[in-house]
């Protein structure tokens, strides 16, 4: 979401955005009507500014559609986490803080529980990217998972940035390797899915 509207970025580039006509609330309702149980929402304004910016919109989505909402973007404090949960989010996706302040995210895992806290690990060329994909770290997703598992990590959303928004297929090899290595972690594949064949595979 940017400025209250549904958008799709190409490879995380804010300058390359496609804006969709449907409002986020209407989109959430449409997904719910199709039987979707859980939707993924990123507050891109929040990701850029380091604090949630679309809380009222989150509240309207939570009230207006009978789906679980996983919410990310700008979640860098305990107060921000409590705010999105208060406004209706079921799950919190934390990426930048988890990668850059690992002890803090470990505390949040223990505080809120691994069933609500989701590690958002966005990768580019094998390394984790943070701060709205504007900065790449010398850190792998495997290193992050290994660190957080003892604290209750059970859910990971992994996006291959080079595939994101391109609609040309995800990084099957990356996700297959991660799932086989960490069988007790639930992975959500993100980035590049452009067809039913991609989903089935």
Name each model feature, range by range.
Residues 38-57, 96, 158-168:
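Glycine-rich, proline-tolerant flexible connector loops at the mouths of alpha/beta enzymes
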Residues 1, 39-41, 67-73, 92-94, ...:
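Hydrophobic faces of well-ordered beta-strands that scaffold small-molecule active sites
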Residues 3-16, 85, 89-164:
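Conserved anion-binding
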Residues 52-59, 134-143, 168-176:
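Charged helix-capping and loop-helix junction motifs
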Residues 62-91, 173-201:
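Catalytic cores of alpha/beta
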Residues 20-32, 76-82, 136-147, 199:
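Short, acidic/polar
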Residues 6-52:
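N-terminal beta-alpha supersecondary unit
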Residues 29, 59, 82-85, 106, ...:
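Alpha-helical segments flanking ligand/cofactor-binding loops in enzyme cores
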